[in-house]
Curated annotation (Swiss-Prot):
Lineage: Eukaryota, Metazoa, Chordata, Craniata, Vertebrata
Chain intervals for the UniProt region annotation (Disordered): 135-154, 161-224, 255-307
Residue pairs linked by disulfide bridges in the UniProt entry: none
Ranges annotated as spanning the membrane: 6-26, 33-53
Tissue: Expression is evident in inner and outer stripes of the outer medulla of the kidney, most probably representing thin limbs of Henle's loop together with some collecting duct coursing through the outer stripe. In situ hybridization in fetal kidney at 18.5 dpc revealed a clear continuity between hybridization signals from the thin limb of Henle's loop and the distal convoluted tubule, suggesting that part of the expression pattern may result from expression in the thick ascending limb of Henle's loop.
PANTHER family referenced in this protein's UniProt entry, alphabetically: BARTTIN
Biological processes, Gene Ontology terms: chloride transmembrane transport; intracellular chloride ion homeostasis; intracellular monoatomic ion homeostasis; intracellular potassium ion homeostasis; sensory perception of sound
Protein name: Barttin
Source species: Mus musculus (Mouse)
Regulates channel membrane trafficking and anion conductance: region residues: 1-72
UniProt topological domain (Extracellular) ranges: 27-32
Amino acid sequence: MADEKTFRIGFIVLGLFLLSLGTFLMSHDRPQVYGTFYAMGSVMVIGGVIWSMCQCYPKITFVPADSDFQGILSPKALSLLETGLSEVKSPQPPYVRLWEEAAYDQSLPDFTHIQMKVMGYSEDPRPLLAPELKTGASSVREGEPRTAQAWMEAPVVVHRGSDENEGEKSHSQSSPSVGPQGSAPLASFHDDLDVGSSEGSSLQPSPNRDEPHRQVPWASRGPLDRFSDFALIDDTPTSEDTVLDGQAREAALPRKQQWSLRMKGETVQARAEEPEQEEEDLYYGLPDSPGNPLPDKELGFEPDIQG
């Protein structure tokens, strides 16, 4: 290895010497001589540099796994390899035999005897909660001691919430009155009362506020109507709806009449106070006189009379 390194260095130095010799001969005007030295020196320098660069990388040696080539390695290297392999610990668990795995699978508990029963909220779960001792039927041969396999049953009772039961009851109560479901009806706001009636109702307190609210028992209360402000367009009105609409219109009509009479009185009073001259001053067209709209006296000339 040292001889090879020395040879590479000498090769590069010889190439540099040839380059310097060619430069010296070039000064004496001999082109056929210094060209040869230049070419040889450049080739030797480039080759030596590339050779040195290739030797900087580590060498890869392939060792065959055949037993015939074990004699090539020294006994010291073999001992080092054996000690290194013994020190390395494999992360894998030790090998488990198949019969041990089968025995472990058989030792696991069997959950086939578990049963599930759905109970309502009103049912009593105490009969199920009472522990029962059962003995499993095992095949017992004659002459062998009889071993009783016993286990305890621990039932888990899960009740459905009261909200679900109330929802089911309300659904069952409302289902007979509901007809066959078709297309979903449209919805709209109640616009029977106009703005005037709403303003009049806001000025006058409603008589319904003075009436005490009826106490409705909690049991008879159904789910809250969240869409009470909507009216179904496609839905056919029932008798109760028509009665309620008639009462609302009757209560709204006197308020509307009072408001309209008040507005009419105010407009008549305002018209009486305005002078008629102001109306004539604001008129920009021809006067509404039954006669000639353009009298001759205003024109300032007499029409020609041809007799």
